[in-house]
Amino acid sequence: MPELPEVEVTRLGITPHVLHQTVTDIVIRNGRLRWPIPDDINQIKQQPITKVRRRAKYLLLDTPVGSAIVHLGMSGSLRVLPAGTAPEKHDHVDLALSSGEILRYNDPRRFGAWLWQPVDTKHHVLAKLGPEPLTDVFTADYLQQKAKGKRTAIKQFIMDNHIVVGVGNIYANESLFSAGIHPQKAAGEVTPQALTVLVDEIKAVLAFAIQQGGTTLKDFKNADGKPGYFAQELQVYGKGGLPCPKCGTELAEVKIGQRATVYCSQCQQ
C-alpha cells in the first residue's frame, strides 16, 4: 500500500505537469472504487489546477471551485502520459490537461478513491487527521502529551492517523528500530527522552524514503512509472528471522494490531 513517502513522491512527480494547467475533460471508465466517484467531480472541467497538495495519504488537486481528492488505496498510481495514449486494463480515470497531456489513474484492486471537496469546505475524510510528521507541529512535546497514560502499544499509537498521519506499517517498523524502542511497549511508558529520539527518527526515515523515491514492494510506481528504491534500505521490515543489522540477534516477528511487526529483542527495549 502506498504510504506517505510514496504519495509525496507522486505529488512531486505530477506537480510540474499539472500545476496551472486547465482540466479540459475528465474521463471515468470505472467509478466503482472504494467509494463511488461522485458526479460533483465533473465540476473540475474547465478549471485550472492552482495547487497540488498532500494531506496524510490523500492528494488534493485544488481549483477555484473545489478540490479533487485522490487516494491511491492498495495499488493505485498516477502517471502523466501524452494525450491519445490508449488506456490499459485498470486505467479507471483520466484528467485531460490543456498542455496536451493526461493524468491517468490506474488501480487494479480498486481500493483507492476520487472524491470532491467544494471550495471553503473540508471533506469528512480529512476532518479529524493529526499533524503532518514532517512539520514543526509534530514534536516530542506534542507526542508526550498525546501518549500520557496510554496503554496502547507504541507502534499502534504512532500509526493512529488521529495522533500523527502517514506513519504506515513499513515506516513504523523502521522508525522504532532506529529509535531503539520495543514496538509492544505501552505508549505512556516510553520516556520523554525516547520520544524525542522517536520523533527525530520518524522524520528522518520518512524524509529519506521520499529522497529514495518511496518503497516498492509490489505495486507502487511513481508518476514516471518507475519503482521506489527505499526497499533496498529497509533494516527490519519484512526481515523476521534474519540477523539484526546492528547486533546480529535474530529478528523477531509478531502481529501488533493485525500488522506484521519485526524488531530486535536486544536493540529495542
From Swiss-Prot:
Its recorded reaction(s) are: Hydrolysis of DNA containing ring-opened 7-methylguanine residues, releasing 2,6-diamino-4-hydroxy-5-(N-methyl)formamidopyrimidine; 2'-deoxyribonucleotide-(2'-deoxyribose 5'-phosphate)-2'-deoxyribonucleotide-DNA = a 3'-end 2'-deoxyribonucleotide-(2,3-dehydro-2,3-deoxyribose 5'-phosphate)-DNA + a 5'-end 5'-phospho-2'-deoxyribonucleoside-DNA + H(+)
Q: Which UniProt keywords apply?
A: DNA damage, DNA repair, DNA-binding, Glycosidase, Hydrolase, Lyase, Metal-binding, Multifunctional enzyme, Zinc, Zinc-finger
Give the EC number(s) under which this enzyme is classified: 3.2.2.23, 4.2.99.18
Q: Does the keyword Lyase apply?
A: yes
Q: Organism's domain of life?
A: Bacteria
- Disulfide bond sites: none
Q: Name one GO biological process term.
A: base-excision repair
Q: Where is the signal peptide?
A: none
Family recorded in the similarity comment: Belongs to the FPG family.
- Protein known as: Formamidopyrimidine-DNA glycosylase
This chain's source organism reads Photobacterium damsela subsp. piscicida (Pasteurella piscicida)
